Amino acid sequence: MPLDTKIKKVMVIGSGPIVIGQAAEFDYAGAQACRVLKEAGVNVVLVNSNPATIMTDNALADEIYLEPLTAKTIKRIILKEKPDSLLCGLGGQTGLTIAMQLDKEGFLEAHGVRLIGTNAEAIDKAEDRQLFKDTMRQIGEPTIPSEIANDVRTSLDIASRIGYPVIVRPAFTLGGAGGGVAYTPEELEIIAHTGLDASPIRQILVEKYIFGWKEIEFETMRDSAGNVIAVCSMENFDPVGVHTGDSIVVAPALTLSDKEYQMLRSASLNIISALGIVGGCNCQFALNPDSFEYAVIEVNPRVSRSSALASKATGYPIAKITTKIALGYTLDEIKNDITGKTCACFEPALDYVVVKLPKWPFDKFAGSSRTLGTQMKATGEVMAIAPSFEMALLKAVRGAEISLDTLNAKPLTEENVLSRLKHVDDRRLFTIFEALKAGVAIEKIHEITRVDNWFLAKLKNLAEFEAELAGGMTDARYLRGKQYGYTDRALARLSGAAVLPHRSAVYKMVDTCGAEFDAETPYFYSTYDDECESRAFPRSGKETVLVLGSGPIRIGQGIEFDYSSVHCVWTLKKMGYDVVIVNNNPETVSTDDDTADRLYFEPLTDEDVMDIIRVERPIGVVVAFGGQTAIKLTKFLDASGIRILGTSAAGIDLAEDREKFDQLLESHHIKRPRGMGVKTLQEALAAAKELGYPVLLRPSYVIGGQNMQIVHDASEVEKYMNRILSTGIENPVLVDKYMMGSELAVDVI
C-alpha cells in the first residue's frame, strides 16, 4: 500500500517536560517521527513545551510551537495551522490524553482533523480499564480478577470481594502515577483517593495482587492491513509488583520455556489485533512460574519507554516504523535500514543479551523511601549489551554511575542479610549477591524474593568466581573475569594482584538478524573474543573524532546534554569528520544508529572508553557536551595522552576543582563569598568555625547541585562530610560562607 496521499499537514504533539515516567525516550520517538514525515514531503506542525529537545529543532518541523501542552492550546494551534492529521502516539501519555479529549469533544471531526496511526476507538479500548477488560474477555485472554471503581467506597467494596492485597491502577496515567499496593482497607482508602485524583477520567482498576508471578513484556507492531509481528520479548528481574520502569529488565526473555514464550507471543499478537492498534504496542503479562497460567496486565497503545529499550536492544526502530505505518505503508513495504536487505515484517533475532538498569534519584534525596512498587521512581536508565547475562549486568552496573564496578555494595542498614532480602528496594540486586556470597541457598533467596532461579544461578556464578579470585590471579582467571564483565581495576582489587595480564575488548555488531545477513549500520558492543567486527568495518578514510555522551537521565543532568551531544555530532559530520559516539542511554537520539558514523553502546568509564579509542584511533575526544559524566573522564584521558578537543584538561580542572577555582578568583581580585578547600572532616569543621555558620558545602566535579548543602552547625558538617568521604573523593570540598540574595547566571562563548 503506498503513502496515503490525503496526508498533507500533520500535527505532532510532544511530551513536554521530563517527569518521572516520561523522559528522553519521547524526544527520541518524536524526533524520529518528524524526520520520517519530512522525508515523506509532509508539512509538520510540532507542539512541545520543552526547548531542550532535538524534536524542537528548526530542521525537524516546518512550524514549531513552544507552548503549554493543554487541550486549549492545541485547539488554538489547530485553528491557526489547519492540519489534516494528528499524530499523538509518540508524545507519551500527554499527547494521547489531549488527543482523546479533543476527539471525545468532537473538535477533531468538526475541524477535519483525523488521528493517523491508531484510532480513537482502539486507544479507548486499551486505556479505559473497563473497555480493555471487556475486550480481553471477548477474545478469551485471561485477566487478573479486578473491577472498576469511580469512587473510594466502591473500591473498598471490590477489595472485600476479591480479597487483599490489591493493586490500584488509575486509567489514562503514566509511570503508575497514583497507583499502589494496598494490604488493608486503610491503605486502600488512601491509594484509591490518590488514584482517582491522578486519572483524568476519575477511574481506577482494583486488581488482585499476584505476588511472585513473573512480569513479561512483548513489544509488537501491526500495520493497517493486519500484518503483525513481535519485535522483542523482555523479562523483568523483579516479579510482579515493581513498576517495569523500576525493575532490571532483560531482553530477550531468558527464563521462559519454548511453550511459555510461544503462548505469550501468540497472546500479544491476538491482543494488538483485537484492539485494532496500528503501529507499535507494548503488552505486559503476569506469568505463574509454577504453571502455564498467565494473565494480561495492561497494554500501552503507543510508543513507550519499553519501545525505546526494545528499539535499541534489537536495532528495530519502532517509532520510525510506527510513523511510516501511520502514513499508510505496510510492514512489507518498509526496508530494514540496518541490514539493507530485509523488510520490517522480519522479526528481529538477538544473539546477545541486553540488560536495562534503572537510575534512581535517591542520591539527591538521601532521606526518601527507597521502597519500590507500582509507582515509578527512576529518572532514567542505562542499557548494556553483551554475549552473556553476567557481562551485560556488570556493564550496566558500572555504567549507571553509582560508584560501583561490581555487585559488592555496602549495606545501608545494620539489618542481617535475610531481613534485608525482604525489602523491595533499589539495593535488592546487591543484597541478593551479598546473600549468595554469605552462603545462603538459591532456594531460600527465591522463596523470599521470588526472583527466578536462573537469574540467581547466574549471580552465584559471579559470587563463586570472586571467591576463586581471592586465591590469586592466573591467565585463565583473568580471561574468565573479562568474559564475565569485570574491569581490570576490579580484578586487581578482588585478586590482590599488582600486575595483570592485558587483553583489550573486541566489538560485535547489532544486526537485528542474529548474523543471518551482513549489517550496513555500524552499531557495536564490546566482548572478549577473537574477531573484532568494528576493525573490519569499512572506513571512509576521514579523520575520526570521538564524542562522549552523557549517560543516564538524572536530576541535574537531563535531556539537554543529549541535545548538545547530537548537535556536536551533526556539526562535526558537516565539517568532514567521521564521528564516533559512545553512550549507554537507550532513551536518547544520540544512541540512534544513524546519528553518528559509528555508535558504541558502552559504559562511560575509563577502561571502556580507552578500549574504543584503541580501535578507532581518533584525532581527539570531545567531552564538553556529555555533562559531568564525560567531564569526569578528562583527567584520565589527558594523562593517557589522548587529545581533549575544546577546553583543555587543565582548563576544565581549573573550573571544576573548587579550591583551584577559588585561587583563580583570588588572583584576579574577583569578589566572592569567603571560602576554603578541605579534604577531611577536621578541616571542614575548622573552616566552618572560622567562616561562621551557616556555610555552604560543595564538592568538586558535580552538576545540578549534587551533594551541595547549606549547614548550620557542627553536627550537620560531620554528617555531610562522613557521607561525602565514604564515596572516595579525589578533589577538595569547598566550604564557603552562605550568603542570602539573588543569583544571576551568564553564558559566554
List where the protein language model places each region:
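Amphipathic alpha-helical
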Residues: 184, 334, 490-524, 713
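Acidic/histidine-enriched active-site and ligand-binding environments that engage anionic O-linkages
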Residues: 157-166, 686-696
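ATP-dependent carboxylate activation and anion-phosphoryl transfer catalytic cores
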Residues: 2, 27, 32, 39, ...
